[in-house]
């Protein structure tokens, strides 16, 4: 992908979905921007004020909205198609362990770059990449897509704790070499069943010291829930291959306590009963609906999420547990999986929780069409609706890809 032009631009759109807290939709307005949004006004006024120095972009029949944020993916598994087994979390996990080295070797530059292009074509301007091996570092750093790069740490065998920590530090320090506003190193603690408490504590202390974002998988399966609650189930048989006498490192509550006052994305959480255990100021839930359907046969209880006032966001997860990294495919899947939701209301919520709400949590000054925000946005082909309340829904239903994508005000060439 290449970036085109640094010049100020005036973009005219038929409808502008601002994705602000009221889900305001503007009609027949212009957005003036360079790398940030300078003004939103009538097109004639924009041309009169800025026309001599600005490039005119005429999308008078189309829709403009903020670029999506996909905060949880695994690009290192981009080679998977039918290698991994779905339908049962433990079967899937065993197939991952058996195949991960082969799949990571097959995830060459071209495979990862292809999936990044798919993400961008579906309107994604920012990703949260969970990196287990570090083979994706330079690819993400040079991809043109904004990347929060979660260096992953795990390890349950007490004989290899120091080795696990040193390997993590080596990968993290390497990723720091690429740090800028488009590539942000961060930390992922894999999960409570795979990460010894001493490693989780070290990772959390490291994050506090260096002001880093964190991510973790949490209560993705019934197996994990039973393991943390009591410790005696099929999960123990699985864990015997990593430790002679495996025992739970945590209870669900004690695991969460390690992330106190740390901005953390807790991914999945489909077997969480009480969301009040999270801190709404520092914690958010990442929802991967397709992945949960394939592996856990359960989905997130959105009513419990809303009642707790905790932020939630939408992610595709990786091709290890999904058939597509196209973000619009994931949004459509949510409409079907959460079949008790009002379609139009839920569509608006999905768009907000994939843009402005996630940006606020991640500390990114974007995700909303408003003055001063970073100019990350997408153009969608126009269509007619008789009711404005249908716009969000029809954007999700009618589009496989965006027409154009701008990241930091620069046009992305697909």
State what each model feature region is.
Residues 182-313, 320:
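Active-site core of metal-dependent hydrolases
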Residues 79-110, 148-154, 221-262, 334-344:
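Active-site gating loops and adjacent loop-to-helix segments of metal-dependent hydrolytic enzymes
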Residues 374-414:
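C-terminal cap of metal-dependent C-N hydrolases
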Residues 300-383:
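His/Asp/Glu-enriched, well-ordered alpha-helical/loop segment
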Residues 32, 63-64, 81-145, 166-180:
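Alpha-helical scaffold segments that flank or form the walls of functional sites
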Residues 1-50, 360, 364, 410:
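N-terminal metal-binding scaffold of metallo-dependent hydrolase/deaminase domains
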Residues 14, 31, 35, 61, ...:
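Divalent metal-coordination and catalytic microenvironments
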């Amino acid at each position: 992908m290449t970036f085109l032009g640094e010049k100020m631009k005036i973009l005219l759109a038929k409808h502008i979905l601002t994705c602000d807290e009221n889900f305001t939709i503007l009609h027949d307005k212009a957005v003036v921007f360079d790398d940030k949004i300078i003004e939103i006004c009538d097109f004639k006024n924009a041309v009169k004020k800025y026309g001599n120095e600005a490039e005119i972009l005429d999308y008078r029949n189309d829709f403009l909205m903020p670029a999506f944020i996909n905060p949880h993916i695994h690009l290192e598994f981009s080679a998977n198609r039918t290698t991994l087994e779905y339908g049962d979390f433990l079967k899937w996990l065993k197939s991952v362990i058996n195949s991960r080295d082969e799949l990571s070797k097959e995830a060459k530059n071209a495979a990862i770059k292809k999936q990044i292009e798919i993400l961008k074509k579906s309107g994604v301007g920012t990703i949260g990449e969970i990196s287990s091996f570090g083979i994706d570092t330079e690819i993400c750093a040079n991809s043109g897509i904004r990347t929060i790069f979660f260096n992953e740490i795990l390890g349950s065998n007490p004989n290899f704790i120091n080795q696990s920590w040193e390997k993590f530090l080596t990968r993290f320090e390497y990723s720091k070499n690429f740090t800028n506003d488009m590539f942000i190193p961060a930390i992922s603690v894999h999960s409570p069943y795979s990460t010894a408490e001493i490693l989780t504590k070290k990772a959390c202390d490291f994050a506090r010291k260096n002001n880093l974002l964190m991510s973790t998988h949490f209560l993705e399966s019934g197996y994990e829930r039973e393991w943390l609650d009591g410790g005696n189930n099929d999960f123990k048989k699985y864990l015997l291959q990593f430790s002679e006498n495996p025992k739970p490192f945590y209870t669900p509550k004690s695991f969460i306590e390690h992330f106190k006052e740390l901005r953390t994305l807790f991914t999945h959480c489909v077997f969480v009963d009480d969301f009040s255990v999270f801190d709404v100021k520092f914690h958010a839930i990442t929802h991967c609906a397709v992945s949960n359907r394939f592996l856990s046969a359960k989905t997130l209880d959105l009513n419990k999420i809303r009642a707790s006032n905790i932020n939630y966001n939408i992610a595709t997860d990786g091709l290890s547990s999904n058939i597509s990294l196209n973000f619009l495919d994931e949004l459509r899947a949510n409409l079907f999986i959460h079949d008790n939701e009002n379609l139009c209301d839920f569509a608006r919520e999905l768009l907000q929780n994939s843009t402005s709400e996630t940006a606020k949590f991640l500390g990114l000054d974007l995700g909303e069409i408003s003055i001063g925000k970073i100019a990350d946005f997408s153009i969608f082909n126009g269509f007619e609706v008789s009711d404005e309340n249908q716009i969000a829904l029809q954007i999700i239903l009618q589009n496989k890809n965006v027409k154009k994508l701008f990241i930091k005000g620069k046009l992305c060439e697909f």
